Amino acid sequence: MKKPSLCSSEIVYRGFFDIRKDQIMRSDGQLFDYTCMVLHLDAAVVVAQTSDGLFVVNREYRQPAGDWVLGCPGGRLEEGEDPIKGGQRELFEETGYWSDDISIIGCCYPLPSLLDQKIYFLHAKNAILKGGQSLDPFEFINIELKTEKQLHQEIQAGSKIDGVMCAALWYKSLATC
């Protein structure tokens, strides 16, 4: 199967993210429209652990879900920002925790059918509380410390979980095999 060719592309909405409408042509000449979100910046998500192995996680109010959702600290990288530096920044801003022992454990496109964003997954070992939160006005985050067993139980119980956290924990499990 051949990759379709792009015939035209138009931004139909500009905002925190853009919406782009592309016209694509299949190898058989058939045209179709494809709409996607353009986020412009990649993101970093941090699996942070304290020296005693507890996971530093966020219980964050997410307006689209209409509820509190359990996830990992993280967010959009600044233009040209190194993923490790961005991960450290996001971890500190959202939780007040800091780690100098941080590394990339994977990356992926979380929703390539709709988004152009790539997420870098990082593991921050020996995270220590160095300050308070410095949240954006639209962020509502409670910090929780959990064991790996508690995280697994919450996921298995069907709690409201950010799927990106599940991917982050999976990448962490691969990095420690």
Which role fits each region the language model picked out?
Residues D67-W68, E79, D136-C177:
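Nudix hydrolase/Nudix homology domain
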